[in-house]
From Swiss-Prot:
The tetrapeptide (A-A-P-[AV]) repeats found throughout the protein are also present in many proteins constituting the protective envelope of other species. Component of the cuticle of migratory locust which contains more than 100 different structural proteins. GO terms for molecular function: structural constituent of cuticle. Sequence repeats lie at residues 7-10, 13-16, 20-23, 26-29, 56-59, 62-65, 68-71, 75-78, 81-84, 93-96, 123-126, 135-138, 141-144, 156-159. This is Cuticle protein 38.
C-alpha cells in the first residue's frame, strides 16, 4: 500500500501502551494469537475467538442482544488458534483485562461470563498452560442454557475440553 514500494519505517510500529481505544490497544493480543501454530486445543480456539470478537466490536457491549450471539462475526478459529502449551500469551494479553474492566456494570450476562472466563485465565497462566489438569467447575457446565450461546453442543465445547 505504499507508493513506489517503499517499506514502512519501524516508527509505524506502535506499542500497545499509549493507544486510547481499548480495541486498538489490545491489537498485539490478536497478532500474538494469529502467529501461533495451528495445532491448537479446542479450548484455546474458543477462548481466543471470543476475545477477538469482543475486541473487534466494542460497541457490542452496549447491545446485549448482539453481544450474546457468539456465532456471528468472529474470525475463523483455525487462523486465531493458539497452542495449549509453550508461549507467553498471558503477559501480552494484559490489555484485554483492562478493556474488559472498563465495561459498564450493566453488561449482559453473556458479557459477564466471557469476562470472568478471560480474567480467570489471565490470572492463572500456569494452570491454563495445563488445561487437562484444570477441571471446569460445575458452575461453568451449562453456558448454553444460562447464557444464550445458541446450542448445547457449541456452548458446552469448552467445558468438555476443560480449561
Amino acid at each position: 500500500g505504499y507508493l513506489g514500494g517503499i517499506a514502512a519505517p519501524v516508527g509505524y510500529a506502535a506499542p500497545a501502551v499509549g493507544y486510547a481505544a481499548p480495541a486498538i490497544a489490545a491489537a498485539p493480543v490478536a497478532v500474538a494469537h494469529a502467529v501461533a501454530p495451528a495445532a491448537a486445543s479446542v479450548a484455546n480456539t474458543y477462548r481466543i475467538s471470543q476475545t477477538a470478537r469482543v475486541l473487534a466490536a466494542p460497541a457490542a457491549y452496549a447491545a446485549p442482544a448482539v453481544a450474546a450471539a457468539p456465532a456471528i462475526g468472529y474470525a475463523a478459529p483455525a487462523i486465531a488458534a493458539a497452542p495449549a502449551l509453550g508461549y507467553a500469551r498471558y503477559a501480552a494479553a494484559a490489555p484485554v483485562a483492562v478493556a474488559h474492566a472498563a465495561v459498564p456494570a450493566a453488561a449482559s450476562v453473556a458479557n459477564t461470563y466471557r469476562i470472568s472466563q478471560t480474567a480467570r485465565l489471565l490470572a492463572a497462566p500456569a494452570v491454563a498452560h495445563a488445561p487437562v489438569a484444570y477441571a471446569a467447575p460445575a458452575a461453568y457446565a451449562a453456558p448454553a442454557i444460562g447464557y444464550g450461546y445458541g446450542g448445547l453442543a457449541y456452548g458446552a465445547a469448552p467445558v468438555a475440553k476443560v480449561y
